[in-house]
Amino acid sequence: MSPARAEVDAAAGWWHGQHMTGDWFGARTAVEDRGVDLRGRWRGIYFGILDSEQGAGNAFAQELSFWLDLDAAKLAGWEGLRGLSGFVEGRWRDPGPEANPNTYVEADSLFNPSRYAGGTGWRLMNFGLRYAVPEFVGVKDGLVVTAGWLQPQKEFVTQPLARLFANNAMGSAEGLGGNIPYGSSFSTWGGVLEVRPVERLYIKGGLYMSYFNPTDPANRGLHFHGSRSEGNGLFFMGETGITPEFGAERLPGSYSFGGYFYGEDNEEFGGNKYGFYGQGEQMVWREDGEQGLRAFSLFYFAPPENNDFSFYTQAGLVYQGLVPQRDRDLLMAAVAVGQYGDAAAPSAGQSVFVEAGYQVRLNDWAFVQPFVQLVTRPAGTSAVGDAAILGVFLGVDF
């Protein structure tokens, strides 16, 4: 093989690989075989604000994330540790005002056009241990226990389709973040127990420490002691769900119902809070393989007396492979609506957020996603003007 041909093959292998940084000359595969999985990603979102309360403008938000996963059985070379793993995640988000489109839009934080506006700077997100019983009551991984410095958002109300979007309401907070610390910047001590009595049914519960102002950028995700002057409390989440397949095409779906109790009683927070939610994702039509149309929806209720939002709902559609020869591209559109509660401004009504986009998959490790966002009554009243945004969501996995 000529040197030129070898270079072309190497470039093609890199482009069609799993990571931008490649296989590290074989080192990545070697360490993964020993139970060490180290990976990272970069995300950037450009917001071209066409109109808003503060007029036209621009913003560019960025996030760098790093993960380290450890497989105890492979590390120790002992099969008796099969199912035990450790994990660590760290993150950086651009803290500058030029990164936050809400400088112009002035929306309630739940309806921030950017999912990367909270918990800025360097931040420790989570670390801990997870044990999945290899077989429990005849079900693979039928019992899973997780404990450590955790993020409830990664364990509950998981909607992968909603997290394709750039805005905060769908991509991170999922309604709950409008009333309690819940989104992608909230970390706390806790434990989660998940049981699958049968293959397609699960029941899980999580108990966490609640504390004052947990997503403050100044604490860097290191607020292990919680609040000293304000006092700590308990945060419980419970959820049950099913993962059925429908029809001759065996169209996959996921449906769940859950609730929470957030116990933190201080003057600023407004006392203990609770709420209930239900969500579903369903493939409704299959074109070929993974190609086809999927739908998702979520609803969330909370008492209006001490919550900013008494009701929130989101729904959307995602079509994979609509354009010929672009089998992995995604066409998406969704809407989110939040009804303000008594804890918000007395005159507040609803905010409505619409986002539509098209994700171009360049390869396994990079995408470009142009999108449009429309925000009606961004802060719940006509006092803040509507907003229109054109943007581009970029991603690279390394």
For each feature predicted by the language model, list its residue ranges.
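Membrane-embedded beta-strands of outer-membrane beta-barrel proteins
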Residues: F66-L68, F127, G191, G238-T240, ...
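Solvent-exposed loop/turn segments connecting transmembrane beta-strands
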Residues: A56-N58, E230-G231, E267-G271, F301-Y312, ...
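Transmembrane beta-strand segments of Gram-negative outer membrane beta-barrel proteins
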Residues: V8-W14, R28-L50, G86-V88, G96, ...
